[in-house]
Amino acid sequence: MRTYAQLARLDRPIGNFLLLWPVLWALWIAAAGVPDLDLLVIFTLGVVVMRAAGCVINDFADRHIDGHVKRTRQRPFATGRVSEREALLLFVVLCLLAFGLVLLTNPLTILMSLVAVVLAATYPFTKRYTHLPQVHLGLAFGWAVPMVFAAQTGTVPVVAWLLLIATVLWATVYDTMYAMVDRDDDIKIGVKSTAVLFGDLDRLMIAILQGLMLLAMVQVGLHVEASTAYYLGLAGAAGLFAYQQYLIRRRERQDCFRAFLNNAWLGGVVFAGLAADLHL
């Protein structure tokens, strides 16, 4: 069981936070600060289950690669502790669990969940064919946003798509930082990423993406007529983005990873501003 837990990254909760924050942003906006408790539970559990499923299929896709990358060479596939059949079975079971949760919502959300499964299942293979797997990951992570609006309101309004765009931009930012950790190994074995694509322009491109993410969140705020508290949250996020730029200035592996981890705090700061705006 410990091996399966490691395969599903249950021992590394950072991914759950990165997935959960946009879901909470969406829930609070869609419900004007008072989301249905059952939907809060459904989507929180769904985040944990689908993130685990995504990690399993990612390791399956990278089973011939992870042994050649310093950061991943101790993963279950790389060390021979899990078989392909076991991983695929676990992926299917997790997807079925997630689908069972979605069945507790409404027809529109159920239909949209099919797209979520396709995005999660195909993401790990994109790094073989495009330098933009981080964008695909953003779509996979962010697709829960329109699903939340569908579940809470029965529709997917414009603000949901604005929030999805912001989430995709944010995911591209932090996953590019994550990819910078493995860039040297990825170049050697031919794995593609935005970190490889950007090269020496990586910090500049990350800064541009950070700015665009904040701009998208400003548009969300304007759309919902947010107050000062919301924009103070965005100001806090901007400060954390600046700190992340400081961390990655030398492009050292450990510092890039610290910058990646810092995004869990950033999502919380944005949520705090949003919640304060809706409740004060």
Swiss-Prot record:
It catalyses: all-trans-octaprenyl diphosphate + 4-hydroxybenzoate = 4-hydroxy-3-(all-trans-octaprenyl)benzoate + diphosphate. The chain crosses the membrane at residues 14-34, 37-57, 88-108, 131-151, 154-174, 204-224, 228-248, 260-280. It is found in: Cell inner membrane. It comes from the Bacteria. It is a multi-pass membrane protein. Its main location: membrane. Gene3D superfamilies: UbiA prenyltransferase. Its cofactor is Mg(2+). One of its GO terms (biological process) is ubiquinone biosynthetic process. Signal peptide: none annotated. GO terms for molecular function: 4-hydroxybenzoate polyprenyltransferase activity. GO terms for cellular component: plasma membrane. Pathway: Cofactor biosynthesis; ubiquinone biosynthesis. Keywords: Cell inner membrane, Cell membrane, Magnesium, Membrane, Transferase, Transmembrane, Transmembrane helix, Ubiquinone biosynthesis. The keyword Protein biosynthesis does not apply. Pfam families: UbiA. Belongs to the UbiA prenyltransferase family. Catalyzes the prenylation of para-hydroxybenzoate (PHB) with an all-trans polyprenyl group. Mediates the second step in the final reaction sequence of ubiquinone-8 (UQ-8) biosynthesis, which is the condensation of the polyisoprenoid side chain with PHB, generating the first membrane-bound Q intermediate 3-octaprenyl-4-hydroxybenzoate. HAMAP family: UbiA. This is 4-hydroxybenzoate octaprenyltransferase. It comes from Halorhodospira halophila (strain DSM 244 / SL1). The gene is ubiA.
